[in-house]
Amino acid sequence: MSAVFTKTLVRASQRRSFEVAAAPSVGWHVSERSDRDVIREQLFSDWHRVERTLLRFNREISELRRQGWIDA
């Protein structure tokens, strides 16, 4: 899979990761993780769902940055 979007933020010993990757013949693999735990993981075949997920990721990343999280 090749990454379309990837962002990892850290605060102290905590880590949050967001990723969208192209999944050949399936569509896109979307995942959100907190430390080692999977918060959400989905496969999408519709790019519009991926776009909505990217908007949500960007809102969440902005909120985390306001809370003091920084790029890893």
Q: Where are the predicted features?
A:
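Short N-terminal "domain-start" leader segments
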Residues: 1-28
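Short, mixed-charge low-complexity intrinsically disordered segments
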Residues: 15-16, 20, 60-72
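Short, surface-exposed linear segments at secondary-structure transitions and domain or protein termini
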Residues: 26-30, 48-57
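A short, exposed loop/beta-hairpin motif centered on an aromatic-Gly-Thr core
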Residues: 35-52
